[in-house]
From Swiss-Prot:
Gene3D superfamilies: Ribonuclease Inhibitor. SUPFAM superfamilies: L domain-like (SSF52058). This is Leucine-rich repeat-containing protein 69. LRR repeats lie at residues 13-34, 36-58, 59-80, 82-103, 106-127, 129-151, 152-173, 175-196, 198-219, 220-241. It comes from Xenopus laevis. Belongs to the LRRC69 family. PANTHER family: LEUCINE-RICH REPEAT AND IQ DOMAIN-CONTAINING PROTEIN 4, LEUCINE-RICH REPEAT-CONTAINING. It comes from the Eukaryota. Keywords: Leucine-rich repeat, Repeat. The gene is lrrc69.
Length: 345
């Protein structure tokens, strides 16, 4: 039956070919003769590899390989220079060979849902035209920072994986509009997410998040889903304070940072000559109240932002707990309205 369809397609110089659900164990090599083909559908078969003859499909823009038996992304796709949409959902893929990503300069959409992936190759950055990447329902434990170099990415779907953190480089995805991270193991979000000025939809439901980054309320979200997280609640209680004792490292760091902040030429010159010290100090934080720069020791507080009127939220969420860092109890004791210490149970 498949051979008959292919023969008719060759005679008619077809631009599309539907071989879905034919129980194919291999792709007939005659498909390579369909040089006018722009869309090839091979869903719901028994395929585990592609023939090299497919490389002749120089005009192919859409390739459907969902619900087959592929264990890795087939390297043959690198020859499909015009490919824009690639569907590989519902396979057994646990590997993406770096070579498979060569030549896919025009790929806009990649669907890898429902596979067995634990990681992505660093070469993912080669997909510079990619706008939508979906890797829901895999076993992803981390995402490489190189993924954040995809400047045209608009949608990133990573729901139902095993992610416990996100790279700081997430802030590089300046065109991102939709980020789906539900049902992972995230305990927080990087501060860099607040730089995603086009982000409209954020889904972090079903994680372990207690509070959001300090500038989260400034992200232009229209939809926020965060149900089934242990979010901090506004329940003030009396607590005794124990004045902090700074380590020698912290005292020294604050002294140096203070001089650097005041543009002291001696300290600026010295820090330029000591790259290790410069690297350590680059991870500084800033007190939300007094503006003091500090390194490793701080008081983690929270403020609550009313987001109900600003965006669509899940579970009737009205007050969003937003992380605030203070340099000392001295600042905390200024009794700034709306800033609360985080209770440790």
């Amino acid at each position: 039956m498949a051979d008959g369809l292919i023969l008719r397609a060759i005679r008619g110089k077809a631009k599309t070919l539907n071989l879905n659900g034919k129980r194919l164990q291999r792709v007939p090599v005659a498909v390579g003769c369909l040089i006018s083909l722009t869309e090839l559908q091979l869903k719901n078969n028994l395929l585990c590899r592609l023939p090299v003859e497919l490389s002749a499909l120089c005009r192919l823009r859409v390739l459907h390989l969902g619900n087959n038996h592929f264990e890795k992304v087939p390297e043959e796709i690198k020859y499909l220079k015009c490919l824009e949409r690639l569907h590989l959902f519902g396979n057994r893929i646990s590997e993406i060979p770096a070579a498979a990503l060569d030549g896919l300069d025009n790929l806009l959409f990649l669907n890898l849902n429902n596979n067995l992936l634990e990681h992505l190759p660093r070469e993912i950055y080669k997909l510079q035209s990619l706008e939508t990447l979906s890797i829901n329902n895999n076993h992803m434990k981390a995402i490489p920072k190189e993924l954040c170099f995809l400047q045209n990415l608009q949608e990133l779907h990573l729901a139902n994986n095993q992610l416990d953190s996100l790279p700081d480089e997430l802030s590089y995805l300046t065109n991102l509009k939709e980020l789906r991270l539900s049902r992972n193991q995230l305990t927080g979000l990087p501060e860099g997410i607040c730089k995603l000025i086009k982000l409209k939809i954020l889904d972090v439901a079903g994680n372990f998040i207690r509070s959001f980054p300090s500038a989260m309320h400034r992200v232009p979200l229209t939809e926020l889903y965060c149900e089934e997280n242990p979010l901090l609640e506004k329940q003030p209680v009396f607590a005794r304070q124990q004045e902090e004792i700074l380590t020698l490292k912290e005292i020294t760091a604050r002294l140096i940072l203070n001089h650097l902040r005041s543009r002291n030429s001696f300290f600026i010159e010295q820090i330029q000559q000591h790259p290790e010290a410069r690297s350590v100090l680059s991870s500084r934080n800033i007190c939300a109240l007094c503006g003091t720069w500090f390194l490793d020791m701080w008081l983690e507080c929270v403020t609550f932002v009313d987001v109900k009127k600003k965006m669509k939220t899940s579970s009737n969420l009205q007050l969003l707990p937003v992380r605030v860092l203070l340099c000392s109890y001295r600042c905390f004791n200024q009794k700034q309205a709306g800033i609360f210490g985080v209770a440790v149970q």
